[in-house]
Amino acid sequence: MVFYCYYQPDIYLFSLLNQMTENEIEIRVGNAVEIFEQGYNCSQAVFMAYADAYGIEQETAAKLATSFGGGMGRLREVCGAVSGMFLVLGMHYPATDTKDKTAKTKNYDAVQRTAKEFKAEMGSYICADLLKKKHQPENPEPSDRNDKYYALRPCRRCVAIAAQIVGNEITKQY
């Protein structure tokens, strides 16, 4: 038996997002960095910073984004902050009807535009490139968060950039 769950966007929430000011985006960017500094992974930080705008509780957002940290479970593939950005875009530009090619195209267009913008800012959207590490799976145990961790990694900046880019994207009027 197959069950289908359709997400019905809340028009009120979308209107709030479309009216979000630069200052409100900056607050969400700051929240994303703060969430990251609390120990959540890069993907969780970006997605959790915007989850409330889509009626998603923080715990649910953290669960949904967990596996994307460290470039997808420390595989060092697509940066987790970028994946978090894409999760937000999936909520903002949903493609829930399999026959609605227009919705899927709109989502993919937003994904490609924001990925290009992130790459222009950071040089890559691949975790291994950003960390200057070999492109191979690592020990699955997350690194300890300490001053050295934050000093040697661009992750905090990646979180801020991704949160800024997605904030700008979801406030555009089309």
Question: Across the structure, where does each feature detected by a protein language model lie?
Answer:
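Polybasic, low-complexity association/targeting segments
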Residues: 17-38
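Phosphate-handling active-site elements
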Residues: 53-63, 91-110, 174
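Acidic-glycine-rich active-site phosphate/pyrophosphate-binding loop
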Residues: 21-23, 50-67, 133-140
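A short glycine/serine-rich beta->alpha loop
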Residues: 30-37, 68-76, 147-153
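C-terminal binding/interaction regions
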Residues: 108-174
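Conserved phosphate/anionic-ligand binding catalytic regions in large, soluble enzymes, centered on
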Residues: 76-87
